Curated annotation (Swiss-Prot):
Reaction catalyzed: 5-(2-hydroxyethyl)-4-methylthiazole + ATP = 4-methyl-5-(2-phosphooxyethyl)-thiazole + ADP + H(+); 2-[(2R,5Z)-2-carboxy-4-methylthiazol-5(2H)-ylidene]ethyl phosphate + 4-amino-2-methyl-5-(diphosphooxymethyl)pyrimidine + 2 H(+) = thiamine phosphate + CO2 + diphosphate; 2-(2-carboxy-4-methylthiazol-5-yl)ethyl phosphate + 4-amino-2-methyl-5-(diphosphooxymethyl)pyrimidine + 2 H(+) = thiamine phosphate + CO2 + diphosphate; 4-methyl-5-(2-phosphooxyethyl)-thiazole + 4-amino-2-methyl-5-(diphosphooxymethyl)pyrimidine + H(+) = thiamine phosphate + diphosphate
Protein name per its UniProtKB record: Thiamine biosynthesis bifunctional protein ThiM/ThiE
One Pfam short name: HK
Region (Hydroxyethylthiazole kinase): 1-287
Organism (species): Symbiobacterium thermophilum (strain DSM 24528 / JCM 14929 / IAM 14863 / T)
Enzyme category, top tier: transferase
Entry's EC annotation: 2.7.1.50, 2.5.1.3
GO MF: ATP binding; hydroxyethylthiazole kinase activity; magnesium ion binding; thiamine-phosphate diphosphorylase activity
Binding site for ATP: 116, 164
Residues annotated for 5-(2-hydroxyethyl)-4-methylthiazole binding in this entry: 40, 191
Cofactor note: Binds 1 Mg(2+) ion per subunit.
GO biological process: thiamine biosynthetic process; thiamine diphosphate biosynthetic process
Binding, 2-[(2R,5Z)-2-carboxy-4-methylthiazol-5(2H)-ylidene]ethyl phosphate: 400-402, 431, 451-452
Length: 480
């Protein structure tokens, strides 16, 4: 199977970019470096003619005007009739009502294939309050609110949605992928976002290639968009290593886009919010065949919690769990013990309010570790977020036989309380089993944490599948 950069260079798609005049030259140079052929016709009389010959169309609102809107509408309708990819960059949506209306009009009147924007722009398209700061928008990883907004836009308009930031998200409304690539210098060069949009268009025009995206699933457009963003981000990382500042970075970035070779592996994966859908807590006493059944059922988040065994036995048991998780592509976090997590090579830790502070764990484990925090109040949730937590465990939601000293249950409101206070994925825990997961998801949870409902079931694999199916239906990832 050829790589995405190779496919673009082999097929040399003609990309018609109706982009903003501030970044037009940069976008054209970037497309040429990537192996595509740019054409930048913006006039309302000319744009439909060019779109009739193009392999892909980019609609960018950066320097919007009524005349440019008309050109985009007419070119977009020609492109839609021809069935070529149309990629919208809703620059400034949410910043002014005019831009938001313009972006929505294009989505309603043109068959848009993909939208690429920052978190504030995507929130605005979903009808929610966002934050737009110039052309770059808010920093950081898209939180659950942004992810939900992206899925809503994708479902409403039948398109792909890409949210770019420190971590990029791509969704078709059901499948969602997270892309880890890029460098802070990219935000200091005007037009890197515009160029990323154009690369998405070129990638979609070049097609999906002949090979599989996974062991049992063919490549889809959502994979192609994720690869295009990885291409841009990887070029940015490589350019930064050779640059002394924004000026030299810009030249190095174009050079890196022109390089051939594979993209780095392991940078595209389901986001943490999807892995958290079913979160199972195991111990040293969990039989290996039970753990295997749970993982085969689709669980992709395991917590190892063991307080009774001596430390050497904990280490041995945790290592077995780690190996099982790796075979299935699941994440492993260790309850409380940062030292044990480091020793077995776990993906991270889960910390209670009386454990090592989140900030200290982050310093020890580094920026890529997954760190969860147990929270019951809005204040605890905000503190965990500010300290660097990746997700929150909230509960007890219901009465739980697994932890008799957990106190009175809060009901699903505990999930709503902490998820509204801190825009992090939340896992509800405590007494959750089949038939009880949907209300927790409706309250704002990304998933549910379980122990006895799965591990104590006559058929742990079937119980895990039942709860996971309930969660996915409640999240809208599968049909009810």
């Amino acid at each position: 199977m050829s790589t995405l950069p190779e496919r673009v260079r082999e097929r040399r798609p003609l990309v018609h970019a109706i982009t903003n005049c501030v970044t037009m030259e940069w976008v054209a140079r970037g497309l040429l470096a990537a192996g595509a052929r740019p054409v930048m016709a913006r006039d309302a009389a000319e744009a439909p003619v060019v779109a009739a010959a193009a392999d892909a169309l980019v609609l960018n609102l950066g320097t919007w005007s009524p005349g440019l809107q008309q050109a985009m509408l007419e070119a977009g309708q020609v492109a839609a009739r021809r069935g070529i990819p149309v990629v919208l960059d809703p620059v400034g949506a949410g910043g002014t009502e005019t831009r938001t209306r313009a972006a929505l009009e294009l989505l309603e009147r043109v068959r848009v294939t993909a939208v690429r924007g920052n978190a504030g722009e995507i929130l605005a398209l979903a009808g929610r309050d966002g934050l737009v700061r110039g052309v770059d928008g808010p920093d950081g990883r898209p939180g659950p609110q942004t992810e939900r907004a992206a899925r809503a836009v994708a479902r409403r308009f039948g398109c792909l949605v890409a949210v770019t930031g420190a971590t990029d998200l791509v969704t078709d409304g059901r499948r969602t992928l997270a892309v880890r690539a890029g460098h802070p210098l990219m935000s200091q060069v005007p037009g890197t976002g515009c160029l990323a949009t154009a690369l998405v268009a070129a990638a979609l025009a070049a097609g999906t290639g002949a090979g599989p995206a996974g062991r049992d699933r063919p490549m889809e457009d959502v994979d192609v968009v994720a690869e295009a963003l990885l291409w841009a981000g990887w070029a940015g990382e490589q350019a930064a290593s050779a640059a002394s500042g924004p000026g030299t970075f810009a030249a190095a970035f174009l050079d890196r886009l022109a390089l051939r070779g594979p993209l780095p592996p392991g940078r595209i994966a389901p986001p943490l919010s999807e892995r958290l859908s079913l979160y199972v807590l195991v111990s040293g006493a969990t039989p290996p065949d039970v753990l295997e059944a749970v993982l085969q059922a689709g669980c992709r988040m395991i917590q190892f919690r063991e307080k009774r065994l001596p430390l050497p036995a904990q280490l041995e048991a945790a290592a077995r769990v780690r190996e099982a998780c790796r075979r299935h592509g699941a994440l492993l976090v260790v309850n409380d013990r940062v030292d044990l997590a480091l020793a077995v090579g776990a993906d991270g830790v889960h910390l209670g309010q009386e454990d090592l502070p989140v900030a200290a764990a982050r310093r020890i484990l580094g920026p890529d570790a997954v760190i969860g925090a147990t929270c019951e109040t809005a204040g605890e949730a905000r503190a965990a977020r500010d300290a660097g937590a990746d997700y929150i465990g909230a509960g007890p939601v219901y009465v739980t036989p697994s932890k008799p000293d957990a106190g009175e249950p809060y009901g699903p409101d505990v999930v709503r309380r902490v998820s509204e206070a801190a825009d992090l994925p939340v896992v509800g825990i405590g007494g959750i089993g089949p038939g009880r997961a949907a209300p927790v998801i409706a309250a704002g949870a990304a998933g549910v944490a379980v122990i006895s409902a799965v591990l104590g079931a006559p058929d742990p694999g079937a119980a895990a599948r039942a709860i996971l199916d309930e969660v996915r239906r409640a999240k809208g990832e599968v049909s009810a």
